[in-house]
Amino acid sequence: MDENRNEVGGGQLIAGYLGIILMLIGGIILLPIMLLAVYPEESVYASCFTIPGVTAILTGYVMSLFIRGRDKRRLIGHQDALIVVFSWLLAILFCSVPFMLTGKYNFTQSVFECTSGWSTTGLSVVNVEDCPKIFLLFRSVMLFFGGVGLVLVMISVLSDRHGMRLYCAEGHTDRLVPNLVKSARMIIVIYTGYIISGTLLYIYFGMNWFDALNHSIAALSTGGFSTKAESIGYYGSFGIEAVTIVLMLLGSTNFLAHLYLIRGGGKNFFRYCEVKFQLILCALAAPVLSAFLIYGGLEGHVGQGFRDGLFQVVTALTTTGFQTVPSFAVWSSPLIMVMTLLMLIGGGTGSTAGGIKQIRVCIMLKSLCWIIRSKISQKRLIHADGIYRISGYEYLKAEERLEASDFILLYLGVFAAGTFILCACGFGIGDSMFEFASALGTVGLSVGITGYDASPVVLWTETVGMLAGRLEIYVIFVAAVQFGREIKDGYKKTEGR
């Protein structure tokens, strides 16, 4: 009997894990207060962070008591998905409180801004030119932790036997080393190292330290939040744009690929199908976009046209959302179409980027080629085809092809639904497709639909799209079903008493 009492499972186990994550969220909310040492004049905003931060820590501590010092039962069903989704919802809700406490933003706008931050999207309702620095840093802090993932950060601190299930449920696919905790810590070390390097390079090319830090985090997390209304275009610097392109490409590349590259496995890195596919897409799309910009009269100088064309292709494909052009509202339909396609494809698996993911598109295109080849072949051949992963050449199973095609179909279905809602709000089909592709792909580029004055319907549609895109849709559906089961089981237990 004593052993059973010391075991915890079901709702208490879920609540306990959420408590640990909520304490982590509280700590994250308090981080921007450190900036007051440099900008003491913004201490008036300190309470905006201390109130929700301390509340989250205390609430999380109470919830964590459910599992403290007790043996944890195995997670059953899809409780892992439920924990991940609720973790992200708690992060968004608690982080929205500082914005609401300023009195400038309502609940919808605050939740939208924080969903954009945690999902590393970059769409915004904030006027960055009139925003206190402590809130600009807070947005970047959300990008940092949203990029690596809440669960991954928790695992790096705690060693837990359920960690792998939670790690996978959040969308991470690869372990850098056999030990999961070491994998999580290694990802954070690589991630932080790139950010520090990017910050120093930005300072070298003329940014002040505050802008450099924020833009480095935003570029590597493929988040796109900027401290300037004109984004990267404000600086008009080739060096800054080059650093940004490198950081965006690094952020959209699988972290396992980074490890191989750092350890000297350059051969495998450049053979990796996602790296090759990304470089090929950039090489094909950049000249097309540049040509339309130049001949469409949107760029007065050929060199600037190619510069902007390459930058916008990379920012769309990596789902970052920085821009060097004044506005997308004046772009022609072919330009909008190219950008929309790139945003739908997105970045690599196991990276900070969103979208369908390049590996799935690679598998779909390869499958299509194999089908065509088998159709035109005069002999009936059985092909055992595969693709280059970072570890080497691997044959593809039928289940992998089916999973890729199923996800693409589901993704496009959600994309169509979101586009329809924006169209119903009175926007054109092209603009609606662009805007929702940006939200669902966690990109952050906008044709002007999203902003402080956007309607609640638009903001909530994009909020759902951003969260679904960051958690790869399936997890949301699975968590919803599991939540229903938990309520049903709890009701049955209550009836049994």
Residue map of PLM features:
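Membrane-proximal intracellular helices of multi-pass ion channels
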Residues: M1-R497
